[in-house]
């Protein structure tokens, strides 16, 4: 859980690979925002899709925002933009704590676990190390149960909510 009264800013990176970036609604991060709000955490949502000067818009918002915790979602094609976003964020807010969730880290984590179980250091291990160097916390799997622990001081580098043995794993009975 974030500190009492601490604002969390959730960021949707642009999808520059799409002809119309507003075609797909990003529901996962909005559900995460709802969980935070329900827990009494002040939330900002910054949707950078369709914004040509998205880095300047982000920097402007980050300079004025009371948030110290910034969470991003990213699909694999959004990762280059998410990388630019986190780099720009760190330029103007070196105090920021960054969290990455979404489909990309979920898939990278699954491939990483497989490679490690086989004793391999392949593309997934390289990708995981790169993400670990860019973000403070990585959330694999659904973020609804993982966001509060991810925002807590001293959160682990990886929160694996994609592991069926994890209490954060959302099975069909708990998926709402």
Residues covered by each model-derived region:
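Acidic, low-complexity intrinsically disordered segments
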Residues: 2-176
């Amino acid at each position: 859980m974030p500190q009492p009264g601490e604002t969390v800013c959730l960021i949707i990176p642009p999808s520059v690979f799409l002809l119309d970036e507003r075609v797909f609604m990003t529901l996962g991060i909005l559900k995460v925002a709802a969980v935070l709000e329900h827990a009494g955490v002040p939330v900002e949502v910054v949707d950078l899709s369709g914004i040509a000067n998205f880095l300047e818009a982000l920097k402007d918002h980050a300079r004025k925002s009371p948030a110290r915790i910034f969470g991003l979602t990213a699909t694999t094609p959004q990762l280059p933009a998410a990388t630019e976003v986190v780099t720009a964020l760190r330029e103007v807010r070196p105090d920021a704590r960054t969290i990455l969730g979404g489909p990309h880290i979920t898939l990278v984590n699954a491939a990483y676990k497989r490679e490690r179980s086989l004793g391999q250091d392949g593309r997934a291990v390289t990708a995981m190390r790169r993400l670990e160097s860019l973000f403070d916390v990585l959330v694999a799997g659904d973020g609804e149960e993982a966001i509060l622990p991810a925002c807590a001081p001293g959160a682990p580098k990886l929160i694996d909510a994609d592991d069926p043995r994890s209490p954060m794993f959302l099975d069909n009975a708990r998926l709402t």
